[in-house]
């Protein structure tokens, strides 16, 4: 397993981010999704295939987190292999090519986010099957190389239930075994991570964390809550 760098979050996840499976991390804007994924990759010590569909990956931020944690920023940057598909068609090509690129020398694959290009397509219903195929390729990569794959997801407001829900909920939910939701709280910089589904941990557990120059850190006086 890969550590998140936050002890309470690792405990919530049963030790960290699982290998050989897809982990879905979703939430609204500025909840810490990208920071968490970057931090996990940084602390993994290996190469990271990072697919950035939203332009949210920042080399400067990665360098800042590395330096704040006493790591070499240049070494950190050299370990991240960045892909920037411009549309859903190119995203399909990039993910397909990962089968030739990723091997056991990689410690992590991240898609940030898996649904950004999917959402802007006019005929989204026709692309649901294609999204499922991309997830299946990512799952194959995870299993073949025994590494974690993190798929970051966006949210949308579902007027039928009057709450925010993950985009393509059923398509992603079918293939992602562990699902973590991140939410903002009223206190500046304070966030909460809620475990919505896991292979062997109780659902509904939560931990509080802060976003700092070091990335994701334990919240001061933060606590973990496990709900059976």
Feature names for model-found ranges:
Residues 85-174:
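P-loop NTPase motor core
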Residues 9, 25, 62, 80, ...:
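Conserved RecA-like P-loop NTPase ATPase core
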Residues 23, 48-49, 107-108, 148-150, ...:
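Structural motif
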Residues 26, 54, 114, 155, ...:
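Anionic group-transfer/hydrolysis microenvironments
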Residues 18-97:
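Conserved P-loop
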Residues 140-228:
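Phosphate-binding/switch region of NTP-binding enzymes
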Residues 4-17:
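Pre-Walker A adenine-sensing motif
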